[in-house]
Amino acid sequence: FGFAVADPGSIYINRGNHEDMTVCTGYGFVDELVNKFSQNTAGRHLLAIIDTIFSLLPLVHVIDENIAVVHGGISDKFDLDSLKAINRRLYRTLTGLPQAITHDENGKDDEGHTHRDWSVLMDCLWSDPAPVSERFPGELKCKSNDERGGGVLWSEQFTKEWLSQHKLGCLIRSHECQDEGYKTHHEGRVLTLFSASNYYGEDEENDGAILVLSPLQDPPGKLLTYSTCYAKGGYEKLRTAELAGKMESAALARVEVCL
């Protein structure tokens, strides 16, 4: 967010499935804000601002009319035009809405939430590409993502059709931790890019990866992988305040350079 403020013409941020205050409550972000700002007026005000920002973040970016970037994936419930028509500001949370919206196909409420729009956003933020070995009943190309409890699994054939419909070359998404920081699916048409190294801590290490795109390169895309380095002797246990201080001072220094 700091970089986006410093250079708004160069930094673009998609919404992911964790940009949802209900999810943030379970994964520690709300607790972190409370620890830093306490439950006073400033802390509550900051939470409200962040909650609003999450709902305003774009869901998809298209790069050079060739590459779609989305957090989770795609489904047979939406194309890019229908996605634009959704008032995403209404959906500050997807996981905290009442069952009247989430379980009733005709569900809607007085605030403007509809089951249709909710299910589209869930598919956009919670879906995964199906492995080639996955079987789909009948002529279906998308099916319920039962392991996650939200979104869909979509087939290789659906990837081809969706990209062809939008005249795009490939889809870049994240949402799944990868040992090498990235993984290709569906004959290279889908790339999972996961930039957080050692996501699960010392129990399960993984590389992070970024993709550098440039029309001047040959090939135009270059993957860079990396891993967090730890000091000799293992992990240094830090309290929340100490950890935040180390990370945020470094981040702020970089933002100040941009400013």
Regions inferred by a protein language model and the residue ranges of each:
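Feature recognizes metal-dependent phosphohydrolase scaffolds
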Residues: F1-L259
